[in-house]
């Protein structure tokens, strides 16, 4: 089998997602491997989203455990996004029994960066007045869309921070990074005008299963695949008319 995800103590031993279980156990002999429980994950996710709705109706879900919230029009806590985030995290901890990290910032790009800053149980705030200073020192690998290939290209150009990217013109960014250059021009300055998409339509539907033991033959895999296909059909049937097979 493979590791779907792991907690932060396990990561300190070098364990990470998509790693073979055997390799993970060699790195961390005391590792406890538990089977996934997606029904439970979906139930907990629904509980958390119910708490979100106490503070705003402008919610853009990203996954079972992540979402953007626009609280700019909220009258709670004197319209303090920081205090709303504090209250929300406390509600989730007390009612659901898990920790939540939150990032407070003027836009989605910076909010995502901020939410990752103090994981697994923290709150990080980027006030509007501090955006310029914060972004200038931000490593380029924190920019959404900068993966291994783009990161290597930036390293070859000695571009280490968003401040370094700011030294390049729109034209130069386009020459080096193609159509992504225009988006880089704005993101490296902390600019992101994307609105919250409350009616966001899912672009895919999937099913998955992690196995305790490797399947040895093609026949074994085909037998398992039949079961997954049936589950996928069931999931399609539960979706609305937006999903067509």
Q: Which residues make up each language-model segment?
A:
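Residues that scaffold, gate, or flank divalent-cation-dependent active/transport sites
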Residues: 1-64, 68, 75
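Short Gly/Ser/Thr- and Asp/Glu-enriched loop/turn motifs at secondary-structure junctions
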Residues: 62-66, 105-108, 241-245
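Catalytic palm subdomain of template-directed nucleic-acid polymerases
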Residues: 69-89, 158
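Short acidic, glycine/serine/threonine-rich loops at helix termini
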Residues: 2-6, 110-118, 156, 195-200
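Long, highly charged, low-complexity intrinsically disordered interaction regions
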Residues: 80-141
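DNA-contacting surface of Y-family translesion DNA polymerases
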Residues: 142, 150-245
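Generic non-transmembrane alpha-helical segments
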Residues: 47, 51-55, 87-96, 153, ...
